[in-house]
Each structure stands twice: as structure tokens, then as C-alpha cells.
Amino acid sequence: MSKITLSRKHAPAFSLIALLVSSAAYAENTTEKTDVLLIGGGIMSASLGTVLQEIQPDWKQLMVEKLDGVALESSNGWNNAGTGHSANMELNYTPEREDGSIDVTKALEINEAFMISRQFWSSQVKRGVLNDPHSFINSTPHMSFVWGDKNVEYLTKRYQALQQTTLFQGMQFSTDQQQIKKWAPLIIEGRDPKQKVAATWTPVGTDVNYGEITRQLVGSLKKTSNFKLETSSEVTDFKRNADNSWHVTITDVKSGKEHAVDAKYVFIGAGGGALKLLQKTGIPEADNYAGFPVGGSFLVSENPEIARQHGEKVYGQASVGAPPMSVPHLDARFLDGKRVVLFGPFATFSTKFLKNGSFFDLLSTTTTSNFMPMTDVGLDNFDLVKYLIGQVMLSDEDRFEALKEYYPTARKEDWKLIQAGQRVQIIKKDPEKGGVLKLGTEIVTDQQKTLAALLGASPGASTAAPISINVIKQLFPEQFKSEAWQSKLREIVPSYGQKLNGNVALTQQVWDETAATLQLTKPPVIQMKDAKPATPEAKPAQASSPQHDMAL
């Protein structure tokens, strides 16, 4: 009898405990689930999400962005130079070999990658995902401009080397100041007529607003039932589940409220924030990397008369003793519906990894595993350290004098200094040197192929489409080979799997079709037979120089 009384007495308590246990179990079982978690609301995640939505539309995708909206960090038009990087004018992609010849290998690689991006954007216009091409891409001639005997000789050889390739046809070269003035009057007016100069000019260059592309891609994804965007939300923790999927904690940056999501696959495309997130995952591959932040500032003119006279992007040569990352350029831009002109970049230093980041970013990503590689890089690249110190010490007058080298008649009152985005350069462990600056961008994946992170800064947004396809290839090797996915990829990028260089007909077709769809200037007709792809028969020039691909 007493046992029955005890049981009745405690029944409500037992019921409450049972309810709490079952509720907890239910909550655990109802954790939000997604096939793909995209961390970061920039051009990289937007591009990857778009490709995945096309090849596997039934997959659920969740995009998480720390700021109040997408494309507010590095993808924002004011936080980058807006160049469609295709190596038409960027001299650091065509270094001089020891024997004096020009190595165009990297230039071809960059150009091929950008043509994939052009086809990707073109296919999105045809699908109605991207609208009004002029809102995000505009024809802008690309020019290289140098002065002095040595630089003129170099540019002459560079032009001759590029003329042996298919992808750089239509380029023109001149050492005549009057001809160059017709291409870009502002860089010649007021210049000593006796100064020895040289320039190349090509009509196939572009100015790209990567922020606008990002906003439109995400806007289209939001219209699909399987895509969800969470802004003002930060990923704060990762735990690997038994099935190798990821249990990810997401925190509302305003309220502090947490919720979790189970994701089969994770992509960390958070720009400067990617390294810290990669370290949080705990995967051993993260131990191989460190990051060093370099910011950039630009002089900008919104004077309509200056913008009217300068409709090109003009890239110069780095000064003697300065690393190639310091190449100055005078850029025609189309931002927020108006034409402006930018000059720079001038390197700045901050311990932040993001423009909207924390001053503790550098310290918080420095670990016992990557401290020595960072030290080794500093010791091995003293010219870079000296350059950065010199840049930080520049006065307003110094910056204006640098502008006048490219625009001799510039007036101070027409220009103001703006701070652009942060670029985190990769430092990777090296068995011989301890640590090296890693060129370009790098995709880091775990052994289980359920997580990928994108590190690095150059050439950046220009290659968002090929990088997205490469991420898919690495995470989903079997599906990638399937005819279903290959067929979809060829719809997105018709030339996928084929090299353009050396194939005149295909190059012309891609040029013409993308130009028509994107409403760009009609490309020149390629006047050459099928060419042999350039071969690096000699040792690549300055392959050991780690600063060639560093980005501001």
C-alpha cells in the first residue's frame, strides 16, 4: 500500500521529468538539417550555391552571413578594384625569365579562368538569374602603361609573347605618346613629350561589380524553396557527427541567441574570416596555414569630367625594389549607377582580417602550429616587410605624387582617400623553408570530403565560377563524373573541359556569345591559325617569388 502511495505522490514529478526528457530528445531530433551550409554571403558562396542549385536542385542550402546583408565585405564594389582579371594588363602575371624571355603560363591560366566566369554569368543572364548586364559588367579597355628604357623593353617583349597565343589577340601596342593619348588622354596630358613610354591596349577588358552579381545571385536563390539565408548570424562552433556530417552552432550577433544545424557538407567562403573558422573545425589540415592581413586604400575621383575622359583600366609596373603586389593602376569604375575613377592601391596595415572584423583577428588565428611559419615568411621576405612599412608611412602628399606619375595634371581637390577591403594572404607550412607565402587562392578540404574552405585573395572574385566548380569536384568526386552533372555543367559553362588557348574557333565563339549576352563591346576577329598552347620550356620566371600573386 505504501509503495502505491509513494508512486502516486511522485507521479507528477516523474511525468515532468519524462516530458523534459522527451522534449529534449525531440529537440535533438528536430535540429535544423541542410545538405549544404554556405558560410559567408559573398561572391564565392553565392556562385557555389548557384551552381549547386542548378546541378542538384533538390538539395537544401543554408547561407549564413555575419553582417546585415550579403556582399557588404570584400565583394562590395567599393572594397575592391572591380577588375575582370584576365591578365591583359597585369604585368605580375607575365614575369621575365632569367634568359630574358617572358613566361605567359600564369597569364593564360588567369585568362582561361575568367572566360569560365564570363560564360557562367552569361548563362545566368539567359536563365533570368542575373538581370541588366550593365548593372554588373561593362566593357572597359585594359591597358598596360610603362616608362623608362628597361620597362619599355619588357612591355615590348611581353606584347610579342602574348601575340603568339590565341587568348590575347586583338591587343595593340604603341610607344607613340600621341597614339597612347587617343587610348587614355589623362595619362599623357602634361607629360614630358621626350619621356620614353609604351602601352598595350585591348578592347576585351571589363569592369565588374562583384557586389551586384552577389546580390542578384542570392536574390534568385532566395526564390527557391530549398534555399535559406540567415543574416546577422555567425558560426561559432563545429562538431563532427558520427556520419561525418557537421553539427554547427550559429549565433545571432544581435541577440546572442544560439541555434544549431546539421549539415552534410560545409563550405567556408568567408573571405578574411575563413582561416579562423577553418581552425574552429578542428580538422588537422587547418594546422598547415596562417594568415597575414594587408589592407588597401584608393584615391577616388567622382568628378564627372575626369570620369568622362578616362574610360580605361591602366596598370603600371611596380617600382624598383617594390614587390609586384604594389602595381599601381588608374581604374575607370561604374559604381552605384555612376562613373568614377580610382587610383591605387596603397597598402595599409591592420590586425583585422575583415574590414568589419576584430583587431584581435591576427592574434586569435596565431597558434603554436603556425607561429614559426609566419616568422620564417617575415625573415625571407624583407623587401615585402620594407614595402609595407613604407606604405604605412605615406603622407597625403606622397600618395598624390604617386597619382601624378600616372595622371600628370591631376588636382588635389578632385580626389579623396577611401579605405577598401582587407586581404588575408596565405602562409603555408613548408618542409624546407618552414613557411612560405602561398600564391593565389587555395581550397582546403578534410579527408572525409565533407568540408571545404577557401583561403587566399588573388585573383579573387574574377575566378569565383571556376573555383566553385573546383570545390564541387573536390567534395563530390563521384557525382562530378556523372553524365547528369557533367551535362548540367556544360549548360552553365559551354566550353567546360576544353582549353580555349590554341583553339581559335572556340575562343572566338566564347568571346562573341558572352559579349552578346552580357552586352559588351563586340570582340575583335582573331586573325591567326590554331596556335600551339604556350609551353613553359624554360624555368618559370621568379617562381620562387611569393609576392607575385599577393592581392590588395
Swiss-Prot record:
One of its GO terms (molecular function) is L-malate dehydrogenase (quinone) activity. Residues 530-552 are annotated as: Disordered. Residues 542-552 have a biased composition (Polar residues). GO terms for biological process: tricarboxylic acid cycle. Its EC number is 1.1.5.4. Its cofactor is FAD. NCBIfam families: mal_quin_oxido (TIGR01320), PRK05257.1-1 (NF003603), PRK05257.1-4 (NF003605), PRK05257.2-1 (NF003606), PRK05257.3-2 (NF003611), PRK13339.1 (NF009875). This is Probable malate:quinone oxidoreductase. It comes from Cronobacter sakazakii (strain ATCC BAA-894).
